[in-house]
């Protein structure tokens, strides 16, 4: 009798995606992050579902309901800490996943890459509306500052901002709709992730060498299921260390105070995973210019496939491009640091130079490095 997993209409899809999938024999641990992101999404949906059972999206009770979850609900503190720190793990995996894609030229699978960028934007939106829900000081003022950016859009900006708010400022209507958005977005992300996987399986996985791996494929199970399981254990280890030993390490102390529209915190800043974009936003002393730079800093990922000039796909054998890639990584870490600093010297000048270098590296230096490496590879005799 032929195996059920190969004939059953549903099991067949799972089999072709996770069991008998032909995978390159040389993919490294950098290829673990796709499965880790899937697990992060499942953790977030499950913990979020149980939190939503006890949370109330009303300005008068939202803050108290979060305190109630932590104090009175069975293991509520654990659910909340796993959900909050799970978001940090999610973004850590996301950034590493995108970095892997840039380093090894995975962006040349254009459909997969473009869906990935849409996924990144959707997850960022999801995290932003989620951060507003506890209705602490930083939740409220973060929502006020970021939604206010819409008013920079010429002509329709103010109307658009008021439409999002459901009034003339961030208030009860805003909180209620943000809860609705935060509930629906994970399911949209799940659907997009399936499309992402669908496009990936049309072409098959890339590999560190960037060379076509068709001549040397191995089944996904057991080789990569066991490899992913190791990554999963490490992810759980870091998540549990964070959630159990220092759950507030990555949070903002201001969010322990209930939202107060009459009292602005001294330093308004988002969670660590948005700080790089926030630094780029703040670097331009013009509202519309800052908003455009903020959008460009993420949407620039969409044009990376068009900027690929090298004859080789991967950076594995391209030392000049490698150097520029690691400068870009250091630059993003610098931007993250600057985004969390007050607006004063020397942070202002660093915060203006770093975004310039960011765009210069991606738009000019890396394409030029690719062309130069092509020239260096040509025989000179």
From Swiss-Prot:
The chain crosses the membrane at residues 33-53, 77-98, 113-133, 178-198, 226-246, 288-308, 320-340, 347-367. Keywords: Electron transport, Heme, Iron, Membrane, Metal-binding, Mitochondrion, Mitochondrion inner membrane, Respiratory chain, Transmembrane, Transmembrane helix, Transport, Ubiquinone. Heme b b566 binds at residues 97, 196. Binds 2 heme b groups non-covalently. Heme b b562 binds at residues 83, 182. Coiled coil: none annotated. A ubiquinone binds at residue 201. Pfam families: Cytochrom_B_C, Cytochrome_B. It is found in: Mitochondrion inner membrane. GO terms for molecular function: metal ion binding; ubiquinol-cytochrome-c reductase activity. Heme 1 (or BL or b562) is low-potential and absorbs at about 562 nm, and heme 2 (or BH or b566) is high-potential and absorbs at about 566 nm. The cytochrome bc1 complex contains 11 subunits: 3 respiratory subunits (MT-CYB, CYC1 and UQCRFS1), 2 core proteins (UQCRC1 and UQCRC2) and 6 low-molecular weight proteins (UQCRH/QCR6, UQCRB/QCR7, UQCRQ/QCR8, UQCR10/QCR9, UQCR11/QCR10 and a cleavage product of UQCRFS1). This cytochrome bc1 complex then forms a dimer. Belongs to the cytochrome b family. This is Cytochrome b. It comes from Pseudantechinus macdonnellensis.
